[in-house]
Amino acid sequence: MQKTQEKKNMKEMEFFTEYGDANRYRILEVIGKGSYGVVCAAIDTQTGEKVAIKKINDVFEHVSDALRILREVKLLRLLRHPDIVEIKSIMLPPSKREFKDIYVVFELMESDLHQVIKANDDLTREHHQFFLYQMLRALKYMHTANVYHRDLKPKNILANANCKLKVCDFGLARVSFNDTPTTVFWTDYVATRWYRAPELCGSFCSKYTPAIDIWSIGCIFAEVLTGKPLFPGKSVVHQLDLITDLLGTPKSETIAGVRNEKARKYLNEMRKKNLVPFSQKFPNADPLALRLLQRLLAFDPKDRPTAAEALADPYFKCLAKVEREPSCQPISKMEFEFERRRLTKDDIRELIYREILEYHPQLLKDYMNSEGSSFLYPSAIGHLRKQFAYLEENSGKSGPVIPPDRKHASLPRSAVHSSAVNSNAQPSLNASDSRRVSIEPSRNGVVPSTSAYSTKPLGPPPRVPSGKPGRVVESSVTYENDRNLKESSYDARTSYYRSTVLPPQTVSPNCYFLPNTMNQEKRSGTEAASQPKPQFVPTQCNSAKPAELNPNPYVQSQHKVGIDAKLLHAQSQYGPAGAAAVAVAAHRNIGAVGYGMS
């Protein structure tokens, strides 16, 4: 036992090595491993928040990998939005000129959209609508900043138990500047083929547009509807075959604009194919959703809507107002001046160190005044050894230490620009976020109430619609109303977003995570089976799942993730759009997730 504990302590000490900021975080567990390094769940002892800390090993071993990491940390600092994953901090290295590893502190997310789709065949129309709404909202913000993600796929969209989605992994993203060749042709495009726009399959167009991300979102949404990838091509030719099998052969003027001669010849010689009606391909989907999906998947990029136009589609009529969705100022060309130069490893090290200092304002000021003198900080190994020894003695029951104030604050954009909010406007429903749920029920058998911070006993869970044997899922999370719209102007530092949707109404769906124990799961399953069936039965999606290809190194194998689609307010009260605003889900047995920068 003692040797095991010593081995554990040694691993934890090796995780942080000599990084001074390590004193601030208490490691909980390793949640992901890969060729890049390790991801750990931890507690921020200054705030009490749970975070994910990604250690990226040997950042400067390859210049291309170092550039990708630099690009991503810079973009995530500049793009602050509730639907984009947030870097909370980057730990300060012990030396400016000698550090090899970096530690990036993210907000902790329980799963990703790939796992949600893979493990659930009972997602409702309300889930479909809310998922697409969040993805398009993130795209609108990115595209107004002239940023193209270029690698959107379910594994790069993180998910929480309350159905909150956040886009991550900006390593392949690019900023478009009108006077640079990067907006004309990108030769380094290596994104996942299944979600790649047709104009990228053969390098069709002479100039790429934000429509490449719109296509990817369409493919992801189709996968949400059916539970399996829409175009799982095995090669570029096979990919084009699958696309044309559904959409039909493109128009002659579209083919004429194809850049790649072989691809152009292949499409011209292809037999005539007709468009397959989307109602036939997706028989259980909302007709309004299919009409929007068909626009997102237009073969010609000029025929696809922008993210803002898609948000204005009748499919989202009562979910939010497009004019209130936040936009971002275009990113300055100077931020990505390094993309135009040939950089050495030392150059990139200097630039990454400069990005790290953005999360340490006082040190950044000192650094700028001293023209780049290095900073050395004492090792945190002794402090961590005491923490883990204390946890072992107390069986891990110690609570986080929460000082009243944070010592450092990051330096993102000071504000996100959005239209003014009328103080006399109708009270709004929080359509994108809800209060976080507790990871497990308290020892006294109560869960926090999201409406008034009161507690209530846990009752037997309701029967899960379309439940499977041995599968236990609880109910869902609350959406909180905000009665003071004067405070509802968008703030980039918060993850709440308010939209004018419904009259003020508090909903208490009582969501909590079940502890991952077999005995409790069996007991809950017995109780759930004894309850009467709810009136609302979600639409069943295709349960067929494809083989999992190209597994994400950040995501470990896991049990199924469960989602309960039960709505607590009948659709007759608010109508389908109102029901969409309160559709949420609860996950169990959550595995590790990725945060980009592979």
Curated annotation (Swiss-Prot):
Annotated positions binding ATP: 31-39, 54
Catalytic residues in the record: 151 (proton acceptor)
Modified residues (Phosphothreonine): 187, 192
GO molecular function per UniProt: ATP binding; MAP kinase activity; protein serine kinase activity
Residue(s) carrying Phosphotyrosine: 189
Keywords from the named record: ATP-binding, Kinase, Nucleotide-binding, Phosphoprotein, Serine/threonine-protein kinase, Transferase
InterPro entries: Kinase-like_dom_sf, MAP_kinase, MAP_kinase_CS, Prot_kinase_dom, Protein_kinase_ATP_BS
Enzyme Commission number: 2.7.11.24
PROSITE patterns, A to Z: MAPK, PROTEIN_KINASE_ATP, PROTEIN_KINASE_DOM
UniProt motif (TXY) ranges: 187-189
Biased composition regions of type Low complexity, renumbered to the chain: 414-425
Superkingdom, natural source: Eukaryota
PTM note: Dually phosphorylated on Thr-187 and Tyr-189, which activates the enzyme.
UniProt domain Protein kinase: residue ranges: 25-316
Region spans: Disordered: 396-486
Catalytic activity: L-seryl-[protein] + ATP = O-phospho-L-seryl-[protein] + ADP + H(+); L-threonyl-[protein] + ATP = O-phospho-L-threonyl-[protein] + ADP + H(+)
Top enzyme class: transferase
Regulation: Activated by threonine and tyrosine phosphorylation.
Domain notes: The TXY motif contains the threonine and tyrosine residues whose phosphorylation activates the MAP kinases.
Family listed: Belongs to the protein kinase superfamily. CMGC Ser/Thr protein kinase family. MAP kinase subfamily.
Protein's recorded name: Mitogen-activated protein kinase 19
Species name: Arabidopsis thaliana
Name of the gene this protein is made from: MPK19
